[in-house]
C-alpha cells in the first residue's frame, strides 16, 4: 500500500533532485505538490516544480502556486547559490500540463481532508504555504500524519552564523508550523551536511542517460563552486533529498525528540531553530519535533544513485 504524500518546494537545485527521487519511491503516492517563493521568486519556483515533475514522467501530479512572499519580512532569494532561475541556468523542457490556479493552501487542505490522518507533507522550502494552511483551516493540523522538513540547524546556520536558509526565509511561518502540534521531523544542517555526493558521483549520474541526468549534472555544476569556496571540496549536499528519502528509508537517519522554537526577534539569532536537546531539564513543553542528528551518508549516496539510474 502506498502512502499519500504532498511535496512543498521552492524548487532550487537540491529541490530538483528531491522531486525526482520522490517519483521513484514505490511506497509513495504523490497526491499533489506546491511551490513557494524561496530560492527564487514564485513564478520561477512554480515553473521549476512543474517542469521537473514532467521531466520525471509525472506531469499528472498537480502543482499549485503558493505564497509569493514571507509573512512579515521581504523575500530574500538565493541567486548566489541557485542562480536567478533557481536551477543554475540548466535548461529543461516546459511542461505541457495544465497550469493550476488554485492556491496551494486550499489544495493542500483538500488533500488532507481526502486522506485524513494519513497524509504526510514533505516541505523543502520556506514554510509559508504550510503556515497559511494552518491559519486558514483550524482543523488542518489534526488531519496531518507528519511533516518532514528540510530546515533549521541546532548548531549553526548557512545563511547567517545562527540560521539556516529555509527557516530564516520566513521565521514567523516556521514558528507557526513548529507550534501547530503537527508531528514534525526536522532535517537540519546537522544531518544534511552528512549526506553528500562527490564530483565522481555526479559524473556517474551523468552517464546514466536518463531524462533527468543532464539537469542534475548541469544544475549542480553551478552550485558546487560555492561549496568549494566554503571549504567543503568538490561535493554537493543532499539537503532536500533527506526528508524525501526518509519516507522509504528511515533507517538512514537517527534523531531525538525535542521541543523547537524559532527566534523571530531581530538580532544575531534571528531565524534560528532553538531546541532543548542539550539541556538537563525540559524547557519547552511541546515536544513534537524529531530532530535528525545522524545520517548514514554512504548508504544514502548509494541508494540515491540507484534510484536515479532506474
What are these regions (language model features)?
Residues 14-21, 72-79, 96-99, 139-145, ...:
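Short, functional N-terminal and low-complexity linear motifs
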Residues 63, 177, 244:
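A residue-level signal for conserved active-site and pocket-lining positions in enzyme catalytic cores
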Residues 3, 46-114, 287-294, 305, ...:
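Metal-dependent C-N hydrolase catalytic cores
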Residues 35-38, 66-68, 265:
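Acidic/polar N-terminal loop/beta-strand segments that form early-domain functional surfaces
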Residues 68, 182, 249:
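Residue-level marker of positions within ordered structural domains that often coincide
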Residues 1-2, 21-22, 29, 168-170, ...:
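Conformational coupling and interaction surfaces
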Amino acid at each position: 500500500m502506498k502512502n499519500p504524500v504532498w511535496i512543498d518546494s521552492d524548487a532550487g537545485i537540491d529541490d530538483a533532485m528531491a522531486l525526482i527521487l520522490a517519483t521513484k519511491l514505490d511506497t509513495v503516492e504523490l497526491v499533489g505538490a506546491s511551490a513557494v517563493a524561496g530560492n527564487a521568486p514564485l513564478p520561477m519556483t512554480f515553473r521549476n516544480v512543474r517542469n521537473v515533475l514532467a521531466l520525471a514522467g509525472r506531469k499528472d501530479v498537480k502543482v499549485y502556486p503558493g505564497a509569493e512572499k514571507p509573512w512579515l519580512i521581504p523575500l530574500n532569494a538565493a541567486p548566489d547559490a541557485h542562480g536567478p532561475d533557481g536551477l543554475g541556468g540548466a535548461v529543461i523542457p516546459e511542461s505541457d500540463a495544465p497550469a493550476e490556479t488554485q492556491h496551494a493552501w486550499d489544495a493542500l487542505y483538500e488533500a488532507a481532508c481526502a486522506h485524513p490522518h494519513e497524509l504526510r507533507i514533505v516541505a523543502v522550502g520556506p514554510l509559508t504555504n504550510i503556515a497559511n494552511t494552518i491559519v486558514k483551516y483550524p482543523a488542518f493540523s489534526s488531519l496531518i500524519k507528519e511533516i518532514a522538513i528540510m530546515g533549521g540547524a541546532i548548531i549553526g546556520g548557512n545563511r547567517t552564523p545562527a540560521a539556516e536558509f529555509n527557516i530564516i526565509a520566513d521565521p514567523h511561518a516556521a514558528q507557526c508550523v513548529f507550534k501547530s502540534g503537527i508531528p514534525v521531523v526536522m532535517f537540519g544542517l546537522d544531518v544534511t551536511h552528512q549526506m553528500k555526493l562527490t564530483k565522481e558521483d555526479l559524473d556517474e549520474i551523468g552517464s546514466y542517460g536518463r531524462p533527468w541526468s543532464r539537469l542534475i549534472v548541469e544544475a549542480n555544476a553551478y552550485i558546487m563552486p560555492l561549496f568549494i569556496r566554503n571549504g567543503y571540496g568538490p561535493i554537493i549536499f543532499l539537503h532536500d533529498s533527506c526528508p524525501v528519502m526518509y519516507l522509504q528509508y528511515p533507517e538512514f537517519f537517527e534523531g531525538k525528540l525535542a521541543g523547537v522554537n524559532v527566534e523571530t526577534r531581530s538580532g544575531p539569532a534571528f531565524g534560528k531553530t532553538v531546541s532543548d536537546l542539550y539541556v538537563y531539564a525540559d524547557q519547552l513543553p511541546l515536544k513534537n519535533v524529531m530532530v535528525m542528528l545522524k545520517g548514514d551518508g554512504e548508504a544514502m549516496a548509494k541508494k540515491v544513485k540507484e534510484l536515479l539510474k532506474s
